[in-house]
Structure formats: structure tokens, C-alpha cells
């Protein structure tokens, strides 16, 4: 089964409706639309691989962190914040070249045809996603906010 989860990118309205119509003849292709919070866990736990068919990114991918927290292998474009997360935070996956259908297909095939590799990627992603417990993430944010406040107070004292 192939599941297309989520809604249109605001920059490309109608994309999913068009894809659904174009590929309506493909068996076992399901479009979920908006995914409610209670449906997130089953969606990930029942998936062998999570694919990010993005051609551009803006900001860190929460979906990558979610996929990692469920121990899932990922396929993603070799660009922006996704590539940085692989490089700096310990996530692992198969890259594809954005806008290249053959590259995307090859990346998916590489994972789904090799169970050992797929499991290895999922384990690495779980480790990366759980490396920083929420308490530690919260403490890092609070410290950073305190530093910002301290800097602003010091600048205000100096008349800036």
C-alpha cells in the first residue's frame, strides 16, 4: 500500500486533488488528507518507509523528527534543512535529487528492497530523534531565552 498523507502545500493548491485524479487507477494508493493527531502513531507504525518528495524546504522538518521517533527509514531530497539534519543530528536516509523522478524511485527501491538496511536506518533515526529528551530541549531553549533577555537588558543600560 502507498499512503499519501497530509494536505496541499499552500504554495501549490490543488496539487493533491490533481494527483488523486491522475493516479486513481493505481491500486492500493490512498490519500489521507489532513491527519488527526490520534491517527499519527498508526500511520507511522504501519509504514515501512517515510518519503519526503519535497522540491524545496523551509525550516526544520517536524515530520522527519516524528519519523525518527517511530524508528522509520526515510527518503528525502538532498537539500536544505533535511540535509543538515542528516549531517549534524545523526539522522540517516536515502537522498534523491529534487525534481528527479528516477532518483526518487531509486532511493525508495534501495530501502524497500533491503530489510536489513531499512531497519538499520530506522534504528539510527530513532536514536537521533530520542537523543535529546524534551526536558533537555526545554532547558536549552530557556537558557537561550535568558541569554537574549540578558543581552537586551545590557544594551538598554548602555543606551542602545
Spans of features found by a protein language model:
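Glycosyltransferase donor-sugar binding loop
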Residues: 1-17, 33-34
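Nucleotide-activated donor-binding/catalytic signature segment of Leloir-type glycosyltransferases, i.e.
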Residues: 16-38
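Short acidic alpha-helix that forms the nucleotide-activated donor recognition element
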Residues: 36-47, 65, 69
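Acidic donor-binding loop of glycosyltransferase active sites
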Residues: 43-59, 72
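Short glycine-rich donor-binding/catalytic loop of glycosyltransferases
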Residues: 55, 72, 76-86, 98-99
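Conserved acidic donor-binding segment of nucleotide-sugar-dependent glycosyltransferases
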Residues: 88-101, 110-115, 130
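C-terminal alpha-helical cap of glycosyltransferases
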Residues: 110, 134-160
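A short, well-ordered alpha-helix in the C-terminal region of glycosyltransferases
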Residues: 110, 117-131, 143, 147
Amino acid at each position: 500500500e502507498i499512503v499519501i498523507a497530509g494536505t496541499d502545500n499552500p504554495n501549490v493548491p490543488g496539487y493533491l486533488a490533481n494527483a488523486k485524479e491522475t493516479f486513481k487507477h493505481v491500486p492500493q494508493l490512498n490519500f489521507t488528507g489532513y491527519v488527526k493527531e490520534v491517527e499519527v502513531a498508526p500511520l507511522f507504525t504501519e509504514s515501512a518507509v517515510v518519503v519526503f518528495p519535497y522540491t524545496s524546504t523551509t525550516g526544520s522538518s517536524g515530520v522527519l523528527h516524528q519519523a525518527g521517533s517511530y524508528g522509520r527509514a526515510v527518503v528525502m531530497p538532498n537539500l536544505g534543512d533535511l540535509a543538515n539534519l542528516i549531517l549534524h543530528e545523526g539522522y540517516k536516509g536515502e537522498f534523491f535529487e529534487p525534481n528527479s523522478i528516477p532518483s526518487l524511485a531509486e532511493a525508495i527501491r534501495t530501502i524497500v528492497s533491503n530489510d536489513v538496511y531499512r531497519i538499520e536506518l530506522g534504528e539510527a533515526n530513532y536514536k537521533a530523534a530520542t537523543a535529546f529528551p524534551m526536558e533537555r530541549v526545554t532547558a536549552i531553549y530557556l537558557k537561550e531565552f535568558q541569554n537574549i533577555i540578558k543581552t537586551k537588558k545590557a544594551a538598554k543600560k548602555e543606551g542602545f
